[in-house]
Amino acid sequence: MTDVWSSRADAYRASPTHASDPDLDLVVEMCEPRAGKRILDVASGGGHVTRRLRERGAEVVSLDPSPGMHADVLAPAEHIPFADGSFDCVVTRIAPHHFAEIGEAIGEMVRVANAELVIEDTLYMSEEHEEAEKLRDPSHVRSYSEDEWRDMLVSAGLEIERVEYFEKTHQTDEWLARTDCTGENAERVRELLAPLSADGGRTWRDTKLILKARKAQA
């Protein structure tokens, strides 16, 4: 999927879903950036989190598997090329639903984190929503419920410190165009998302789950 993501890079950098909204502010706040704090931004995509954290003085390394995203380090979340405890904080935003091996990715993020993780991703809502996501973007693996996230993080040796929810509104046409989803697939996606729209399909909503967790010994 690397080449596909590189071709989408400009669209994701400009995407209002990723570039703004209060959930970005909240993720940055939960990372508690300050001068000298080392933070790894995993699956950094368009670089929105990285830029905001650097503006607050943090020393940020961006990591992404797609060359077109222009990250500092080219690598997937499942294979992070840093030593144990290299970063004070590891963050990933609206990306884990793309991770092929979620357990390995969490294990790697925990390994390189000295203290804390901040994770934002789409909350599991229904099988219809999952089908729509996969039709629109075949790189979508799956979304997870809050209980699943809690289980995965606790099993990885973390203590959940904070949990927040954010309801995000998507412009349907822009959302489909970002992945070149057209024709029959687009029509089917619109049908599947109809229960999540309050305006006849012009927009639809999902819920983002934002968690902050800390290593038990930190």
State where each predicted segment sits.
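Short catalytic micro-motifs in class I SAM-dependent methyltransferases
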Residues: 94-95
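A short glycine-rich, Lys/Arg-flanked "PGG" loop and its adjoining helix->strand segment in the class I
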Residues: 103-117
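Conserved Class I S-adenosyl-L-methionine
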Residues: 46-48, 162-218
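Class I SAM-dependent methyltransferase SAM/SAH-binding core
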Residues: 40-79
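A conserved beta-strand element that flanks and buttresses the S-adenosyl-L-methionine
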Residues: 91
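Conserved class I S-adenosyl-L-methionine
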Residues: 1-34, 48-52, 167, 173-177
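Short, glycine-/aromatic-enriched active-site segment of Class I SAM-dependent methyltransferases
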Residues: 122-140
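Short alpha-helix
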Residues: 142-157
